[in-house]
């Protein structure tokens, strides 16, 4: 078997766009801790289709392999059966929104096991072709879809899988995918081999996607492998970091051979190193480290009485500096931990801000439990330094569009609570005192680099009815002191965006120019038209573009 990839293009314009997309991915300009994140999604089953929990069990085996053999990655599990189904709409809204957020935040790999077709994943339409064509996220995952017909490239109609690849700036960089009807049990060994070959190195180097496909098919004799194909450039390698990372000390104590506990309200200082493939310190690595510390695993009982082990509760997400290959960061363990005295997990990512070289690692030689004897006293809740919708000119009672963008800037000397492990201590936005319009913002909070105790939460509010609304924003610190801010606003349907400024760079251009439009519609679907005129009023250029706007930050 040869490592062949396919570009399902029909026009010269598509060919140009896909080549540019591949070049951009290979140049590795989009660095970030998203490269440590993977998602395994599994369909549910029923007595009528004969699968029951089979899709979830297969996905969990794949996730378990990565967690065991490649613990430097963070595995996100979206198993339908662990979520409540909307029986009226026939879908899983929390799975749907969870997948959209994971894709937006960034995934290195998205893997799906279950039913599917040419226009959607699963009968519940958790992901549809319409969704795919509206993708605007810039972190490009590799997709693996163990389903039916998702990428039927030889049909006159363009399939959903093709659109994942053909999205010129979003979607995915490549797909290991099916072109015909497939079956769950024969699909699993194909999916399993793809995952193993993606992450296992060949003589110390990452395999190209073509080599992954070749190695996968050459180890299988099943005729069902003929229905799997690679959509994308076979010369591309999945863009996970090359360097490794290790923790050397916790609170000045060597991690080798010592028992380490993370106790509630204890201040923890972690030190470590960036290492090359031979285990040597990379002395010229200087940049940023992004640690994520997770509480102990919990067992989630699903609706059909099967279980999954997951790590939904976060102790700390932060950032600090790396200098000459060595890093250090400090945080305080929240009061709301599991107290399980079971193993936790620390995930590490770092990037050299000069060279763009990346590193990743993990540390799990610690347990989570107990309470510190030296905890500091703090009875004051977090300070809400700024709170607004869409932009900083917002005033209480102001008018906004139907999908306003909520922003709050926070500070707390001890730290903001985002653990999600205790009822009543989540960061929440509650609109009109409605449970339907109540949003958990824990995962939308991020610490600001170089700002001790300062962070920001940014959340795109789903569509609201026109009229006046009241909202409450609740936030807690890690000692469970709370702060609440109440504000009002009026939703006006059809409210026009306000354009603050248009900046062209460079100011004097001969060949090309980039236009930056500053407006008050962050994270909104927009259609933008730009016309360029000379001093005599003659139109020189005209362009229209549709997409989702970014968030302008001073």
PLM-predicted stretches and their roles:
Residues 1-319, 323-332, 340-342, 348-350, ...:
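Cysteine-dependent hydrolase recognition
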Residues 354-383, 484-495:
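Short beta-strand elements
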């Amino acid at each position: 078997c040869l490592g062949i990839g396919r570009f399902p293009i029909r026009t010269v314009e598509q060919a140009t766009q896909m080549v540019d997309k591949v070049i951009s991915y290979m140049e590795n300009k989009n660095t970030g801790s998203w490269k440590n994140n993977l998602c395994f999604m599994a369909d549910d089953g029923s007595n009528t289709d004969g699968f029951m929990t089979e899709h979830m069990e297969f996905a969990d085996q794949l996730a378990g392999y990565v967690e065991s053999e490649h613990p430097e990655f963070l595995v996100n599990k979206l198993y339908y059966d662990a979520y409540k189904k909307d029986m009226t709409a026939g879908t899983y809204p929390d799975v749907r929104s969870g997948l959209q957020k994971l894709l937006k935040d960034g995934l290195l790999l998205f893997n799906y096991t279950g039913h599917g077709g040419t226009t959607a994943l699963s009968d519940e339409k958790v992901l549809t072709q319409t969704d795919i064509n509206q993708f605007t996220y810039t972190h490009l995952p590799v997709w693996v879809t163990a389903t039916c017909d998702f990428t039927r490239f030889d049909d006159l109609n363009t399939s959903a899988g093709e659109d994942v690849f053909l999205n010129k700036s979003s979607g995915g960089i490549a797909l290991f995918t099916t072109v015909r009807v497939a079956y769950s049990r024969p699909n699993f060994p194909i999916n399993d081999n793809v995952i193993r070959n993606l992450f296992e190195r060949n003589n110390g180097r990452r395999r190209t996607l073509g080599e992954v496909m070749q190695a996968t098919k050459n180890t299988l004799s099943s005729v069902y492998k003929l229905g799997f194909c690679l959509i994308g450039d076979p010369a591309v390698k999945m863009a996970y970091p090359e360097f490794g990372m290790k923790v050397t000390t916790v609170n000045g104590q060597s991690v080798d051979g010592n028992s380490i506990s993370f106790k509630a309200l204890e201040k923890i200082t972690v030190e470590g190193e960036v290492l090359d493939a031979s285990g040597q310190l990379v002395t010229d690595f200087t940049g940023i480290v992004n640690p994520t510390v997770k509480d102990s695993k919990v067992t989630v009982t699903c609706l059909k009485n099967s279980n999954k082990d997951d790590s939904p509760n976060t102790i700390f997400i932060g950032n600090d500096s790396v200098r000459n290959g060595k890093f250090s960061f400090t945080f305080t363990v929240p009061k709301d931990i599991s107290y399980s005295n079971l193993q936790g997990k620390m995930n590490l990512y770092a990037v050299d801000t000069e060279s763009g070289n990346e590193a990743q690692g993990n540390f799990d030689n610690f347990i989570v439990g107990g309470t510190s004897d030296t905890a500091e006293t703090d009875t004051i809740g977090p300070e809400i330094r700024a709170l607004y919708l869409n932009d900083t000119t917002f005033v209480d009672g102001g008018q906004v569009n139907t999908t306003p963008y909520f922003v709050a800037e926070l500070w707390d000397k001890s730290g903001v609570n985002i653990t999600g492990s205790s009822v009543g201590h989540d960061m929440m936005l509650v609109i009109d005192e409605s449970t339907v319009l109540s949003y958990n913002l824990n995962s939308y909070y991020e610490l600001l680099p170089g700002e001790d105790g300062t962070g920001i939460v940014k959340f795109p509010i789903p569509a609201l009815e026109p009229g006046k609304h009241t909202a409450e924003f609740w936030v807690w610190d890690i000692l469970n002191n709370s702060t609440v801010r109440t504000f009002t606003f009026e939703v006006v349907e059809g409210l026009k965006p306000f354009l603050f400024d248009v900046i062209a760079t460079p100011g004097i251009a001969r060949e090309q120019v980039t236009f930056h439009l500053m407006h008050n519609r962050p994270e909104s679907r927009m259609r933008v038209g730009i016309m360029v005129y000379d001093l005599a009023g003659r139109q020189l250029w005209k362009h229209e573009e549709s997409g989702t706007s970014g968030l302008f930050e001073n």
